[in-house]
A protein has these predicted regions:
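Ferredoxin-type iron-sulfur electron-transfer modules in oxidoreductases and energy-metabolism complexes
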Residues: 23-41, 63-95, 99, 110-140
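Short cysteine clusters
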Residues: 46-49, 54, 58, 93-97, ...
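Conserved small/polar residues in nucleotide/adenosyl-binding loops
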Residues: 144-146
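Short alpha-helical linear motifs
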Residues: 103-107, 141-142
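A short, ordered amphipathic alpha-helix with a cationic face
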Residues: 12-17, 32, 52-57, 69, ...
Length: 146
């Protein structure tokens, strides 16, 4: 774990919503992007619990403390690899999932939970921007067309 006191030093922050009149004219994200520094602070709030209930709260069993730690340490490439270890489509699930992992976060017992959903979305966005996500082609040619 990168910062053992991150959850004490930093409160939960969420990205700002874009104004509704602006959002009505495009199909872009509802929230403004987080800065890298703000996201690292949020990732540092992960307590690396002995039994991380966020993993059990996630329907996919994502290794949430692992990629929170990697984001805190600025190891984005390893973070997307850790995310892809349990989730083939984080670009969809990160946005559509209602984040039961945040409800299961141990920090959420006494304070606001870690912003797990936002960290996941930002990992994926960074991976797309850096060109780390590439299509995986089938090894065997099937004659089935979609």
């Amino acid at each position: 774990m990168g910062d053992p006191r991150g959850f004490i030093r930093h409160g939960r922050e969420m990205p700002k919503r874009r104004p509704v009149p602006v959002r009505l004219r495009d199909w872009k994200e509802v929230y403004e992007p987080f800065s890298g520094e703000a996201l690292q602070k949020q990732a540092s709030r992960c307590m690396d619990c002995g039994i991380p209930f966020c993993n059990n709260g996630c329907p996919l069993g994502n290794l949430i403390p692992d990629w929170n730690d990697l984001v805190y340490k600025n190891n984005w490439r390893e973070a997307i690899d850790a995310l892809h270890a349990t989730n083939n489509f984080p670009e969809f699930t990160g946005r559509l999932c209602p984040a039961p992992c945040e409800a299961a976060c141990v920090l959420g017992i006494h304070e606001d939970p870690v912003t797990i959903k936002q960290v996941e979305v930002e990992i994926v966005e960074r991976a797309w921007n850096e060109g780390w996500i590439k299509p995986v082609l089938a090894h065997k040619l099937s004659l089935i067309h979609i």
